[in-house]
């Protein structure tokens, strides 16, 4: 029996008896979208003819339109652009960048190198912005229920770490005592708040988290790029999963640049370290093999038919 076909070819008979107009309607609804209207000679994004957008809107404005359905205000577009610019690259020590470069030396073209690099931007490397937005939302929910900011922050941190572990995303940095990107991004948020473009609620939450973490640790735990972009994306009303998507979109620029640079530099099969620097071997020392030596006997494989 073929897929989607009932006994005695019922699926085929039902399809043959269906109203052709209804079948066409089903086909056109198969991939329904409110994003683009594309027909011969016509391309409209969210209702706007593409020829009116070309040369009139910036790429960040276009990103906003595609994701949110409307064009942003000038302040909203400027904040989005600032966050995207800030996160484009962090050097070849970032695994995603290194993977993109290594992929080129293994013979992959740019699309393959970029795909290889983007695929590692997951929860541990690439997900901190989304996770930080979740933390901010946890605290914001407590504010909505009437808790003061310091209490909401402390309780929100406790709830988040109880669920996700002790690492708090968006704060502290293994390279930078103070991430140089964060103060500038927060200053832009403050300026936008002064103009009434954003509420400043999540900037206050982010700063409260920074203060509470520093109090608990007894030393400064400054906000990093993920915490700062999480402030911006939350202030702009993006859902947390889009925080990760926007980070990946931004970091893709750096991945492309490094992959292209490596293409020009050449090199074949470059690994994580130069050939002259050995890795650490932790296995047994050299030992001789005796022909009479027997290894451990293998037991029966679970589920194997005798």
Where are the model-predicted features located?
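Non-transmembrane, aqueous-exposed alpha-helical and coiled segments at domain scale
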Residues: 2, 10-306
């Amino acid at each position: 029996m073929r897929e989607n076909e009932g006994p005695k070819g019922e699926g085929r008979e039902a399809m043959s008896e269906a109203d052709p107009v209804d079948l066409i309607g089903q086909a056109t609804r198969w991939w329904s979208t409110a994003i683009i209207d594309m027909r011969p000679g016509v391309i409209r994004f969210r209702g706007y003819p593409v020829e009116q957008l070309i040369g009139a809107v910036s790429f960040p404005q276009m990103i906003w339109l595609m994701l949110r359905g409307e064009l942003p205000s000038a302040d909203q577009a400027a904040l989005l652009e600032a966050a995207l610019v800030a996160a484009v690259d962090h050097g070849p020590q970032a695994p995603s960048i290194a993977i993109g470069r290594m992929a080129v030396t293994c013979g992959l073209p740019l699309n393959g190198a970029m795909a290889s690099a983007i695929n590692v931007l997951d929860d541990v490397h690439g997900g901190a912005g989304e996770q930080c937005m979740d933390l901010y939302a946890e605290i914001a929910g407590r504010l909505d229920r009437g808790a003061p900011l310091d209490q909401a922050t402390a309780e929100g941190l406790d709830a988040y770490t109880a669920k996700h572990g002790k690492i708090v995303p968006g704060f502290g940095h293994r390279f930078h005592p103070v991430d140089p990107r964060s103060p500038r991004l927060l200053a832009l948020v403050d300026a936008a708040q002064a103009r009434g473009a954003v509420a400043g609620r999540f900037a206050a939450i982010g700063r409260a988290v920074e203060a509470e973490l520093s109090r608990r640790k007894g030393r400064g735990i400054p906000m990093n790029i993920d915490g700062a972009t999480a402030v911006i994306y939350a202030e702009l009303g993006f859902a947390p999963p889009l925080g990760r998507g926007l980070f990946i979109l931004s970091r893709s620029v750096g991945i492309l640049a490094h992959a292209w640079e490596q293409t020009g530099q050449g090199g074949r099969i470059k690994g994580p370290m130069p050939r002259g620097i050995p890795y650490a071997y932790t296995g047994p020392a050299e030992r001789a093999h005796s022909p009479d030596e027997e290894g451990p006997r293998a037991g029966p494989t679970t589920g194997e038919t005798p």
